């Protein structure tokens, strides 16, 4: 946030946001310690394009990804343990206590295995056999701004999934994970 470049929310010339909250909650200032207050756009998602082929919405990558993962999770029939996690704070680097870079998932999985009376070695073997996918949206190549995209990686809209990778491991993709995803896509004609 840069105070010189970003808009400060103004809700009233008479009362501050804090005063409005106190009034709405009917509490005194001494009972108000702190809060996380997030403002967001309230526009509904819209189908756009001359053929109605585009969906325009805020946070679309996260919503579409979460929906696809949840749908697959619910409709997959096998007896293996399945875990899905939807982390918060992806847009700010996942560095919060509830973000993907936190200890939350590690601690939850350890507690589950502890409750199942698994030894530490059994827990580690289970983790080693697991497969992790980090889901995010990839920016499609805009025909009006070709120069803004890497010429070696043109991402076509509506042509399937994109697997992101980075030599500095900016993404969760490994060579093994890439191969598994590619085989899954080929097996399912994606």
Listing of model-derived features with the role each one plays in the protein:
Residues 1-190:
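N-terminal hydrophobic/helix-forming segments and targeting peptides
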């Amino acid at each position: 946030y840069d105070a010189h470049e970003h808009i400060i929310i103004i809700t009233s010339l008479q009362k501050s946001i804090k005063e409005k909250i106190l009034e709405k909650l009917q509490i005194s200032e001494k009972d108000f310690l702190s809060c996380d207050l997030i403002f967001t756009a309230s526009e509904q998602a819209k189908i756009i394009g001359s053929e109605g082929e585009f969906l325009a919405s805020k946070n679309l990558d996260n919503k579409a990804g979460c929906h696809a993962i949840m749908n697959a999770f619910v409709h997959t029939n096998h007896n293996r343990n399945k875990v899905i996690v939807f982390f918060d704070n992806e847009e700010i680097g996942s560095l919060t206590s509830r973000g993907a870079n936190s200890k939350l998932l590690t601690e939850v999985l350890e507690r589950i295995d502890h409750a199942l009376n698994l030894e530490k070695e059994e827990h580690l073997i289970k983790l080693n056999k697991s497969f992790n996918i980090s889901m995010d949206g990839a920016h499609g190549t805009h025909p009006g701004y070709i120069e803004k995209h890497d010429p070696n990686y043109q991402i076509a809209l509506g042509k399937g999934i994109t697997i992101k990778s980075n030599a500095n491991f900016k993404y969760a993709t490994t060579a093994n994970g890439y191969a598994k995803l590619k085989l899954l896509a080929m097996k399912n004609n994606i």
